Amino acid sequence: MNETSNNFEFEICANSVESCLAAQEGGADRVELCAGIPEGGTTPSHGDIVTARRLLNTTKLHVIIRPRGGDFTYSDLEMDIMAADIDACREAGVDGVVFGCLTPEGDID
């Protein structure tokens, strides 16, 4: 982990493996890898995830888990997809995943 002032961790949102490497070079403590930035961030490809994991050696890798843009209210099928993506991230050795789910009323689910 890189040392930063006041014990803050420096996280960068990256939309490619190249961006992950630039963040590491710039001293980021953690990278949040995502795709679909115009949609608010979606789950990146498996290839991007495993390549970023292989190449990042001083920066933690977190992966956004989000099957689509739009709201954060997911169907049962979308929840199954998210669970499979989380399993794949675990197998790839990522340091963490990032996700959010809401009820139709807008409460945290």
Language model region names:
Residues 89:
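Residue-level signal for inorganic ion chemistry
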Residues 17-25, 37-60, 76-81, 101-109:
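Active-site-adjacent beta->alpha loops and helix N-cap segments on the catalytic face
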Residues 69-74:
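A short acidic, helix-capping loop that chelates divalent metal ions and anchors anionic groups
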Residues 1-13, 17, 21, 53-54:
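N-terminal amphipathic alpha-helix/helix-capping segment at the start of soluble metabolic enzymes
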Residues 1-5, 31, 56-59, 93:
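Short helix-capping segments at alpha-helix termini
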Residues 8-14, 31-33, 61-65, 97-99:
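Hydrophobic faces of well-ordered beta-strands that scaffold small-molecule active sites
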